[in-house]
Amino acid sequence: MRRLNRKNSDASKKLNDRQRKVLYCIVREYIENKKPVSSQRVLEVSNIEFSSATIRNDMKKLEYLGYIYQPHTSAGRIPTDKGLRFYYEEMLKISKETSEADLAVETFKSMPLADPEKVLFLAGNLLARLTEGYVLIERPNTRDLKILRVMLIPVSEDYLIFSILTEFGVSRVTPIKTQERLNWEEIERQLNFLLRGKTIGEVLLGRIESLKGSGFLRLIESLIGETIERYLDAGLENLLKDETLALEDIRNLLEEIKDQKFLESLVGEGISVMIGREIGRKNLEKFAVFSGRYFKGESPIGSVYFFTSKVTRYDRNHKIFEYILNRLSEYFTSTSRR
């Protein structure tokens, strides 16, 4: 569910069609050129057939309602967060009325089926490249993964490899030093009988009576206890190249996203978009953030975020983000059923 300020929505109803076109034109032009927009420029780049004086009066009303502001006397206008929100909502309406854009994401259709890490890496880098933003993708929680197979592979008289293969192709491997000769094939068969189809979380909670107090339960705990970064990221260089952001802005962002509760607060149902002050952190007011979840069937298994300057292509970015989320959900749903 998109986070929408009802006051903004109600205020936009006070605008007539011409004023909405003027506002749309100002925001689009500012996003394209990063320069204040004059009434003359509005007439040059639009099909609005009114005088410059009429457009100036419309701009005064838009300024009064908080959609645009004038940085100094005699300058053109710059959209506020409220104006950017109007533009984003208008673009959503337009996109629903037109056919879906042909996005340059064909490479994502050939993603590898056996390696979820590569899929997430590809999705993150593709999203960062196409949106020119900074992307965070949350990996699925290891404890929620079902065990597909346990393997015990002798490599010498004193060592064997203990391996757990889970859904999505995620595996954990550790060497074991053995002090006695046992029938490892039979032990592997018994472990698979006990564990196959169970989640790692169920095993660690001690729900498998036969494993309680066993060395194998401790092995599983040590495997899952390995430090794995919760998020992978991509596209930080995009923010560094953005002329609307200062280095201090980027430092602030990197500091804020260390707060897990803050990240979780950004996610709603469907795709959430927060612009400038809507994010709720004063030091992030120059940013916009898109967030959403990807699923395995009906169950959410991870969140995706991308941060960009609030002066951005909302129409294109929304479509790209929606596409990536859908593709990730399709991949993890189909992989879990194999």
Curated annotation (Swiss-Prot):
Pfam families: HrcA
The entry's keywords: Repressor, Stress response, Transcription, Transcription regulation
Molecular function terms from GO: DNA binding
Protein's UniProt keywords contain Hydrolase: no
Keyword Flavoprotein listed: no
InterPro entries: GAF-like_dom_sf (IPR029016), HrcA (IPR002571), HrcA_C (IPR021153), WH-like_DNA-bd_sf (IPR036388), WH_DNA-bd_sf (IPR036390), WHTH_transcript_rep_HrcA_IDD (IPR023120)
SUPFAM superfamilies hit by this protein: GAF domain-like, Winged helix' DNA-binding domain
Domain of life: Bacteria
A GO biological process held by the record: negative regulation of DNA-templated transcription
PANTHER family according to UniProt: HEAT-INDUCIBLE TRANSCRIPTION REPRESSOR HRCA
Entry-linked NCBIfam families: hrcA (TIGR00331)
Family, per entry: Belongs to the HrcA family.
Primary role: Negative regulator of class I heat shock genes (grpE-dnaK-dnaJ and groELS operons). Prevents heat-shock induction of these operons.
Entry protein name: Heat-inducible transcription repressor HrcA
